[in-house]
Structures are given as structure tokens and as C-alpha cells.
């Protein structure tokens, strides 16, 4: 397993692989690896002969009040885990991703609007910029992104499509604990009481999704009823011990345009005609996703389920 600490080293390794016709798959991470990350390597190994895992805590996607300085950094443990898989051919862990005087950023629209961007307006510009850099600095042909960060996945897919980047984005299913909690590096922040309450977010999403599916089968969906279902899910999350819910949103799965319900208050940037069109086709739309973000103590958890 090669360890590359700068762009030149990484590109030299990738060039050697490409010269022999090997397909390179990238698994981008910020470290503090868990079984969810390892599952991405398993998928990457199915799609290419060579797998690169990047480890880089990207400062551009953290606001000043967020947890950049305290974000878990477990480099040696991460390297040990990657080596143990036997699936990682190179680790790209640059000291910095940006040249001195770097002043260019990618600012995505479309799928980046609403949801996470309401409380984290800086986030997707930071994500899109660093992911673009990773694609360039690894010369990968494919990249694996988890569906747990569903909006992020859609933003990256949109960027690749809009900029004709020529890299294939492969979605990977969310990996969960036995009680349903989606694996996340930030789960390590949870104390015992918070950890016991945390699965309520997924449980509420599941129950809401079941109600939405049943409603659609019965009468094609009713906006007031959908709003009630989402409000009930939000109340269940709060009752379980979460302090607040940033959003509980029903969206079209492809472009993440809001469909209807409690997420309407987060859709003010979307054109009114788009929202009306989405509502008209909501009943017949098989591809919808229910997304949520909620805070328990100082920890913010996100999750989603398909509807």
C-alpha cells in the first residue's frame, strides 16, 4: 500500500497504473474511518483494478464555529484499517490541497440549494472545490460516494455532469448499526445517553416513509396529509431527546427539488413554478427521498430514506 503525501507523488503512481490500462477508483474520506468507509473500498474494488483512499480534513467545508479543529484525526489507526482490508493500493493524504494564493472555488447551485445549505451555506462550495481537486490530483476514473450524505452525492454528480469531468460517480448504500443508526465519524462524539437516543432519527424517517408510501397508494397523496406525516416524524425525533430538527424534507430523488410538506420553509430559493410542478407529479413519482438533519446536544446527525 503506497502512501502519497503530495500531488506529484500521487499523479506519478496513477500514471504508472494508467499506463498498464488499470482503472483507478477513488474513495474520498476525511479519515476517522469506520465500517461504512470500508464498505466503500469493497465497492471500489469491484469497479477497478486500483483503489485510492484519500484522507484529508478539508478546512473549506467548515464554518468558523464548526468542529474543524476537534474533528477526529486518527491517521495511524486509519492506515492500519486500510492495510488490513487488502483492497487499498494507495493512500493520498496531502498536507494541503490548495496552492499558496488559491482563490478559486466551485459554487454549486441546483441540488446544493436548501436542506444542508440553509444552516451550512458555506458547505457545498467547500465540498465541491475539494472534490474537484481530488479528482484532478488523483487522476481517478471512478469515485465512490455514500448515499448517507445524499445531498452531497447529488451535488457531486451534478458537478461532474455540468463540468463534463469524465469521471464516473458510483453511489454506495448507507451502512448502519444494528439499531439503525447510520455510521458516521461524528457518532464518536455521542455520549451513552445520546447514543441510545440517536437511532430515533432513522426510526422516524422509516415510519414517515411508510406513511407516505401508503398515502400514495391509497389516494395519490394529499399535501396536508403529507405535511402532517412529516410533522409527526419531526415531533417523534424531538420526543426521543433531540434538541432541534434542522429539516425534515420530502424531495425528488434526482434533483432534490422539494415535493411538499414541512420542507417548504426551506425551499424559498426555488422557483415557485418548479415547486408547483413537483407537487403535481408527486403522486406518480416513484423516486422520492425523505431527508432529515437534527441536533442532539452539540452533535448534528443527518439521515435519509427512499420513499
Enumerate the language-model features and the residues they cover.
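Nucleotidyltransferase catalytic core that binds NTPs
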Residues: 2-242, 263, 298
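Phosphate/ribose-recognition catalytic cores of enzymes acting on nucleotide-derived substrates
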Residues: 232-269, 273, 278-307
Amino acid at each position: 500500500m503506497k502512501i502519497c503525501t503530495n500531488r506529484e507523488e500521487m499523479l506519478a503512481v496513477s500514471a504508472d497504473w494508467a499506463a498498464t490500462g488499470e482503472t483507478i477508483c477513488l474513495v474520498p474520506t476525511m479519515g476517522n474511518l469506520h465500517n461504512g468507509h470500508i464498505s466503500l473500498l469493497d465497492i471500489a474494488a469491484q469497479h477497478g483494478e486500483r483503489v485510492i483512499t484519500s484522507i484529508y480534513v478539508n478546512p473549506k467545508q467548515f464554518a468558523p464555529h464548526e468542529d474543524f479543529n476537534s474533528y477526529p484525526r486518527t491517521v495511524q489507526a486509519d492506515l492500519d484499517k486500510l492495510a488490513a482490508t487488502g483492497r487499498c493500493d494507495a493512500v493520498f493524504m496531502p498536507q494541503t490541497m490548495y496552492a499558496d494564493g488559491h482563490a478559486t472555488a466551485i459554487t454549486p447551485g441546483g441540488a446544493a440549494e436548501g436542506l444542508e445549505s440553509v444552516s451550512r451555506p458555506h458547505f457545498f462550495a467547500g465540498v465541491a472545490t475539494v472534490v474537484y481537486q481530488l479528482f484532478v490530483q488523483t487522476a481517478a476514473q471512478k469515485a465512490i460516494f455514500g448515499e448517507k450524505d445524499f445531498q452531497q452525492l447529488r451535488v457531486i454528480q451534478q458537478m461532474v455532469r455540468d463540468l463534463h469531468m469524465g469521471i464516473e460517480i458510483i453511489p454506495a448504500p448507507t451502512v448502519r448499526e444494528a439499531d439503525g443508526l447510520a455510521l458516521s465519524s461524528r457518532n464518536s462524539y455521542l455520549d451513552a445517553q445520546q447514543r441510545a437516543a440517536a437511532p430515533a432519527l432513522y426510526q422516524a424517517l422509516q415510519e414517515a416513509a411508510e406513511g407516505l408510501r401508503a398515502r400514495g397508494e391509497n389516494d395519490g397523496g394529499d399535501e396536508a396529509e403529507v405535511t402532517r406525516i412529516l410533522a409527526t416524524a419531526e415531533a417523534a425525533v424531538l420526543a426521543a431527546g433531540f434538541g432541534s430538527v434542522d429539516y425534515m424534507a420530502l424531495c425528488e430523488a434526482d434533483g432534490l427539488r422539494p415535493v411538499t410538506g414541512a420542507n417548504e420553509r426551506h425551499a424559498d430559493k426555488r422557483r415557485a413554478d418548479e415547486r408547483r410542478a413537483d407537487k403535481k407529479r408527486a403522486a406518480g413519482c416513484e423516486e422520492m427521498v425523505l431527508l432529515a438533519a437534527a441536533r442532539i446536544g452539540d452533535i448534528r446527525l443527518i439521515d435519509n430514506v427512499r420513499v
